[in-house]
Curated annotation (Swiss-Prot):
Residues 1-932 are annotated as: Disordered. It is found in: Secreted; Secreted, Extracellular space; Secreted, Extracellular space, Extracellular matrix. The modification 4-hydroxyproline is found at residues 15, 18, 21, 30, 44, 59, 65, 74, 80, 110, 128, 137, 140, 167, 170, 182, 188, 197, 203, 206, 221, 230, 233, 243, 258, 264, 273, 279, 297, 306, 312, 318, 327, 330, 334, 343, 349, 361, 370, 379, 382, 400, 418, 424, 430, 436, 448, 457, 469, 475, 484, 502, 517, 523, 544, 550, 553, 562, 568, 586, 595, 604, 616, 622, 631, 640, 643, 664, 673, 681, 690, 708, 717, 720, 726, 741, 747, 753, 762, 768, 788, 791, 794, 863, 866, 884, 899, 905, 920, 923, 926, 929, 932. Residues 47-61, 836-850 have a biased composition (Basic and acidic residues). InterPro entries: Collagen, Collagen_Structural_Proteins. This is Collagen alpha-1(I) chain. PANTHER family: COLLAGEN ALPHA-1(XXIII) CHAIN, SI:CH211-266K2.1. It comes from Neocnus dousman (Slow ground sloth). Keywords: Extinct organism protein, Extracellular matrix, Glycoprotein, Hydroxylation, Phosphoprotein, Secreted.
Amino acid sequence: SVPGPMGPSGPRGLPGPPGAPGPQGFQGPPGSGPMGPRGPPGPPGKNGDDGEAGKPGRPGERGPPGPQGARGLPGTAGLPGMKGHRGFSGLDGAKGQMGPRGIPGERGRPGASGPAGARGNTGAAGPPGPTGPAGPPGFPGAVGAKGEAGPQGARGSEGPQGVRGEPGPPGPAGAAGPAGNPGADGQPGAKGANGAPGIAGAPGFPGARGPSGPQGPSGPPGPKGNSGEPGAPGGPTGIQGPPGPAGEEGKRGARGEPGPTGLPGPPGERGGPGSRGFPGADGVAGPKGPAGERGSPGPAGPKGSPGEAGRPGEAGLPGAKGLTGSPGSPGPDPGPAGQDGRPGPPGPPGARGQAGVMGFPGPKGAAGEPGKAGERGVPGPPGAVGPAGKDGEAGAQGPPGPAGPAGERGEQGPAGSPGFQGLPGPAGPPGEAGAPGPSGARGERGFPGERGVQGPPGPAGPRGSNGAPGLQGMPGERGAAGLPGPKGDRGDAGPKGADGAPGKDGVRGLTGPIGPPGPAGAPGDKGESGPSGPAGPTGARGAPGDRGEPGPPGPAGFAGPPGADGQPGAKGEPGDAGAKGDAGPPGPAGPTGPPGPIGNLGAPGPKGARGSAGPPGATGFPGAAGRVGPPGPSGNAGPPGPPGPVGKEGGKGPRGETGPAGRPGEVGPPGPPGPGEKGSPGADGPAGAPGTPGPQGISGQRGVVGLPGQRGERGFPGLPGPSGEPGKQGPSGSSGERGPPGPMGPPGLAGPPGESGREGSPGAEGSPGRDGSPGPKGDRGETGPGPPGAPGAPGAPGPVGPAGKSGDRGETGPAGPAGPAGPAGARGPAGPQGPRGDKGETGEQGDRGIKGHRGFSGLQGPPGSPGEQGPSGASGPAGPRGPPGSAGSPGKDGLNGLPGPIGPPGPRGRTGDAGPVGPPGPPGPPGPPGPP
């Protein structure tokens, strides 16, 4: 059957989401043919669809910086290449499906409770209460006689303790403590809601017309009609009249019914195996069958491996007491030394003693040996998200890495599609000064004037200033390329330019790999001795040591007559302890016992002497955020972040200066062949003869700055890398000068919108709190090695050094001749983002083009400016509770709080004992007269 004509093209589909970036292709070998003349500029092409972005490569290890290469010889200028063809626009991709919803993780077990905190400081005395109202005046008493002074009364008993007052108002908030250590990664969040259904795709093209069916058989003949009756005889034949008008075309007859079904055709070919079906649901469990008969015993299995040693049996019942034996013969005097007795079991811990009276600080103790480094604690729960820190200053440009080894030449890939029209190149060097123009025509001679009287010669005038520069001559013809001259001496460094304006805060770079530990710094001053840690429990009993060597034999006793078997003698008194045997090898370390009760914190003693440097401690918790270091190598690209809100369109910024050209990038791997049918190869054109070099062209105008790409979406925050071993304190380096900005890369491809990310890592650690006042002196702990101490709190960050002044910008030297192409260098750092251009007018919608070949993936553009922070994701389930932290140092006495509200009146106190009789008071005023 012949396929029908192709139907009209459907409406243009909606644009699909951008694909993942494709791998970077290798650079092909240069062609052998001569380079043709540069063609005229074609019309501006339409932007093709974004190609699929490649998977991010693994960042390579940073090699040591190589030596600086020698300056190459100047090469001859090459001829411009031919303009490439415009690529076909690709079809829109289909919309991707949303991934499955994640399973919520299990809830962690609650951690153990932490140790009791240190005893708080005694609160400051509250303000005095208000004065009560004055009582009514008493009646005037009669003047009493002066009494004698009575004996001094006994001291009254101490009154009961008053009711505890209401708590005062909260005092001012103390300084923020240091931020907690970064918690472990939370459990995966709950499954997200199903995404909205995708936009319906464009309608497909109409299918080709199917083949015509077979013609049905003819129907049976109809019945024969009846014969007509003979008609009446006709009249004479008339004259033929004129032909009538043509009648209308009759309607199409009804479609005939289909014929009978034809015979079945031959059996078709056997189909291939079908795809694997989905597993069916679990069937309903059937009824349990009757128990089967017991099988015959199987053959004896191989002999098993010997089992583990059994536990010691329980102690047997004590035996009957034996008969008292007769006293034995006296042993040698002195007897042999007995074995050292085993140490007794540790006694139960004593009751916790009451805190003693706060003693005076003891004398300054000798510097103790540094304790063993404690084991690294389990990461605590995630701390609260700190405030967003300010963007750090852009780090100095790192030294260029060494050139990588030359890669093996890859297989020649398929012919790629013609690339897009490149951006206009930078302005060429200024042309050579042209020859002076012809002199103008001589003017008409004027009338001779009258000769004046010659005056006296005047004094010599000052030297005239340089005249105005003449007009620029026409560019002269370019001479033949001369031989490269010898390498000139390196010029002197130009003067230091003026300090530039401070640049904008750069985007914080990805965390680079942990570098090797720096050189050991000078030992710092020994810090003040911290509070004594709690005394560890008595260690478990060690294994008994080896038996000591037997002592020398004693003198032999007199041989007595063999006595009869006497009764067993009474138990003798324990003998004297024998001589101590040689020290046996140390037994295995016993298990660490449970921590004992925490004693009261002792008063800090005086500052100890400067101790020797201890062994390197275990890995501490991450310190506070340091200064932004030089940018590390590119890390693995994180998953695409959620789409940020559309930013406001900013005004047109000032035109930036063109930065120096970056080093050419490394050759990437060859890209995969693109989709689509392979086009037929075109006919090779005849090679043109190399033309003579044309005249030096006038330097072209500077190209229009391209529109910057859309603002990139903020990616997920990377997982915090493992904390490396702390490097030794190295000497502070001198602040380097700020490097020149790199060239602006092409705009990067926008990634597909990702799912909402997990909660970001905790913020930087806050500044440490103020030192607390010394607590009361605690009880003296037991001697002996204590358990390993907890890791100390991170130290405060050191002061930031002064930023180095930017050097004065040197004057631009004359452009030298172009040198030969050097080896491909490492890719330079991303340049600053250019100003956002004006939004162009929307062009007319073009016709749908034929699906083109897959284009090469473009170079990765500079990272977009960070988008606005998206909404916080749902908080995950609480992680496992971390181990108890170490007791912090007691804080300083806080400021006196605000006076609290007046509490309710307390209970009435006991009436005090009668005090001593006081001295007689002064005579009162006379009373009023009595009634008559």
